[in-house]
Amino acid sequence: MEAFETFITNVTDFVWGGTWGDKTILPVGPVVVLLLGAGLYFMVKLKFRPLKRFIPALAEVWAGRKGDGDKSKITAWQALSTALSGQVGTGNLAGVATAITLGGPGAIFWMWITAIFGMALAFAESSLAIKYRETDKYGRVNGGPMYYIKNGLGQSWGWLAVLFCIGTLFSATATGGMVQANSITQSVQETSRAFSLPCQLSQPAIKGIRLVNNGVAKADQMNKADLAKVSACELETSNPDTLVIILEDVEGSDTLVNTASVEAGSNNLDTVIANWLIGLIIAALVFAVIIGGIKSIGSVAGKVVPLMAVAYIGIAFVVILMNASEVPQAFAAIFKGAFGWSAATGGFTGAVLAIAIRAGVDRGLFSNEAGQGSAPIAHAAAQTKNPTTQGEIAMIGVFIDTILICTMTALVILCVQGDFVNAAGEPVKYAYQAAGLEATAITNAAYASAIPGGGWVVTIAIAFFAFTTIIGWSYYAEQAVTYLVGEWATKLIRYIWVGVIFVGALTQVGFIWMLGGLANASMAVPNLIAILALSGVVLAMHKKNGDPDTEDGDSIMLKGEGVE
């Protein structure tokens, strides 16, 4: 198993970073080149339409709330919300923190670049999704990359459509389903444990042994005092099975920070709420939504996603205002790090630049999914006959996900100061510099340091973000299965999906997290090949439907085009 995990890690490192083990094969990963290259190509060829048409696109989003009355489809607003339900997930919390940890603050700049170019990719792929969607004999709309591959490139490209569908099922099961359910479970457990810590203040302690509520924990470092008392106790955020115990000797002359791992069999850290119960609740809620298909998913997403996004942005904005003096240095760190500046060397290094690019692009795609091919599956179900209108609405989703929500998370992490210690035992200001913290734990620590009960902000955000991601990706999985085996499997996959979610809530998903980068690439590569091959069609629609440099472009509509 270890050899297999090493192999998967090496493959993922190569496709995203160009490295294999300790060897550098390419300066940048091939998927990064393909993603940024395709984004730059479409941005230039579309004459920077995503930037020029940004304000009109916002108006189209607002107008899309009403729809055209076609009951076989969902409104443009609901399509955007469904796509956002898949885009806005744990990547907006854990992914941002991971990008900063791996690539430094400069990784955020490359997340922005990925998003800006991604807006052009979102326009291209969602426009194609409308043009080449199909309506089956039951009146259901089916669309997405597999359909614009089949109907746009022809049957000879069917193998690419199949590859995309397999990649979709891989990504849906791993990052869109099991990981999200597990994130909810872990978040609920960690927060509930925070209110029932198995630790009593000022409890006598003997060197090397911690007696805690009749359980036994062994301290790693207790070499400065033979007799000590507990002055503080909390769970280690990154590892809920570990207590961080701050000890003082009896005379109070020394303060010792010790990590105490709970001995196997101890009941100190028994889960407060059974994982199976949390999993059952998640599965039941998911089933209640997805059993009604895209109409039900779109209806729920159209209400929940805007509310959760506005609430999270609002809370993050307040935290940033409270730390406004740190904002200038946060942006300085982002821009310096983006181009390879290293605090350690006091200069610019190529290695720092490469790491920042890799981390930013990788986590950026994981968050906004632009170019991955998932969002156009949702946008294909929209009530519109104008492909480019929905394409413009789709690019707003990328902006909301990365430029707004991810940036808010990044600024909270980079601005909020707290009492943290790095691996060398030295005090540091920020959570992302601290030892023992990673992913969501960094974001959690930043909010907890900023406001009372800040950990609850992350817990609630994860619960909502992950839940909406689960329902969004259920539809993507359903569409992939429908394409591969036919309409008869549509309802069957919904029941299977509920089972996947329940298992994900109960399972340790560390290895599945490792598959995330590979899963994203397995969708992105076939999709990017397809939209580049169909770039002529995209540019023709662009010129016919609202070329920003053509005065009367907006008045021209595509009528009857597509395969509906």
Locations of regions flagged by a protein language model:
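N-terminal alpha-helical transmembrane segments of multi-pass membrane transport
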Residues: 1-90, 100-107, 118, 502, ...
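Helix-loop-helix hairpins and the membrane-proximal interhelical loops
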Residues: 11-72, 296-359
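Helix-loop-helix module between adjacent transmembrane segments
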Residues: 42-43, 85, 114-139, 146, ...
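Membrane-interface loop-to-helix entry segments
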Residues: 45-58, 182-188, 274-335, 513-543, ...
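Flexible loop linkers connecting adjacent transmembrane helices
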Residues: 48-76, 95-100, 104-108, 122-155, ...
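Selective recognition of specific alpha-helical transmembrane segments in multi-pass small-molecule
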Residues: 117-125, 278-294, 305-325, 358, ...
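Extracellular/periplasmic helix-exit of transmembrane alpha-helices
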Residues: 123-133, 315-333, 341, 345-348, ...
